[in-house]
Amino acid sequence: MALVKMKRLELVGLNRERKQVLEYLQSLGCVDISDSRCEEVGTAQTAAAISRFDAYISQIMRALEILPPAADGGGMFRRKTNAAGVAYTADEGEISRTVGIAADIIRLAKEKKERTDELSALDVREKTLEPFRSLDVPPALRKTRRTVIRLGTIEGEHTAEELFGEFADGGAADVYIEVISATKQQTALWILYPDYLENEAAAVCTRLNLLAPKGLGAESVAEQLGKIAARREEIARQNSDTNEKLSALAAERGALELMLDRLSVRRDKYRVLSGLGITKTAFFLTGYVPEELADKLSDGLMQKFTLSVQLSDPEEGEDVPSAFDNNALVSPVEGITSDYAMPSPHDIDPNPIMAIFYYFFFGMMFSDAGYGIVMMIGCGLLGFGNFLEPEKRRTFKMFFYCGVSTTFWGIMYGSFFGDMIATVSRTFGKGQLALLPVLVDPVQKPLSVLIMSVAFGVVHILTGMAIKMYMTWRDGNRFAAICDTGFWIAVILGICALAGGSALGSAVLANAGKIIAAAAAIGLVLTQGRDKKNPVMKLFGGILSLYDITSIVGDVLSYSRLMALGLATGVIASVINVLGSLGGGGIFGFIVFVAISVFGHSLNFAINMLGAYVHTNRLQYVEFYQKFYEGGGRKFSPFGFKTKYYKF
């Protein structure tokens, strides 16, 4: 269980076999090809082709998003189609035809969207016109030779008599008012008055907050509403035709998916081609291959092609890609590490050690046997069954093992869906059954669980520091390993011995802890300022280094979340059981209990599982990896068939 050892591959071949060599390497999928360009040799001009493939791929992806889902539902549970016997290359005719289909799908969807936008605009216009439906004069008419016409709406429901009084009070009694429509929300008005009353009437209209509609047009309102209805019917027919065409084109989904993968494979090949060194007759390729595959790869290349292959160990400082090689228990958590950072060539593989703590801490925070069994069943089926692609199963395998740990800690804490066994026994039976804790009841003894959590945190931190000490020692800096890490380990162990001796009443252990911690602290004072030239600054730097103990204490206290989340899971689960039992015994009470339990425990499961996942990751990233893990490496990404729908 370690990082995969890599071999550097250098290959020189003939240009006439270049295409075949690249396709052979792509079919094997075991070589991470590096950029081999240099000033002394030329390169292939592939930028235009790559850009064209990118455009085709983008177009096909947009078309697939538009089409209805695949018959198998797609999504996480869709497996790649085995394309054995199907060529992964396509001629220009096939590409042109398939991209044309994608373009038709996009065009139809665009036209449909434009019509949908038009419908929205028609709805707005109809809403504006509807209050004036019964208006029998052109709405655009605003003035005659001696009169002024105002058209608009005011808030609330009003009568012509009420409004006439408003105008009369405003000095514009010589006015004609027609209420076109009235609802509780608004009243639509048509107002006519002599032009010599413009100022007075305008003031009243302003006071009433008369809002004039915009863009009513020259035709009558009834004619405009009729045209809107006719246009809406026409759009419905056009959308129906478009939907039929899109449904017919849905039969091309398989062809589009196949072409998408074909173009992706071809684009990847052109990207690799752009990084090769090329002369008039030959090409040069470099990369990295796992050591266990190197000889087999070299023999295969030499047998099939006329070329030269050289394998060598990478030199110090090379950008060697990293890959993990772990067993079935450890490999599921590799994604946790790669999400943080891939290891550099200087790092060790942290996964074997991290996996132990990861499963342990997750279970301690989720800590319910019922929830753990649910996780084991669900994630076990998805992780070890044949429902998903192999690369999709890894996360579910990780949560399966987390479920095992959760079940273990649930038994230790006496929690099975909280206190469901005791609640069911008490509500529907004689109250004689209960799951007793094997180790400790966190509700009754939270302090004991807190001490245990902090103790596990100390072990976690010391493990990280021990790894750092080992790596420094391995690199030949033995003095630094002892002074920079060893002394701190001794300080922590001494403090732990002091605390343990005081708690247990053991003066010998407490005194030993004092001596160890004090001696290690003196060692830190004498060595942590060794990079300074001034003796006073050396001493001051050493004394100042002791302030780092506050950071270590903060790290240790952060493990209190192991107690807090574990306690929260059990307490909330028990509260849900209490709520469910309020219906009492009998059939009705049982139905109420089941309904509340299913809903409540599902919610509690989701929330606390997410919390356990997030905080377990945090403990690894912040408290553990920062003690020794440098990262900064590059993930091994072999040149191969990176497809979405088909396996070539």
Language model region names:
Residues 1-354, 389-396:
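Long, charged N-terminal accessory/stalk domains
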Residues 2-8, 19-22, 26-33, 295-648:
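Conserved, carboxylate-rich catalytic/transport cores that coordinate ions
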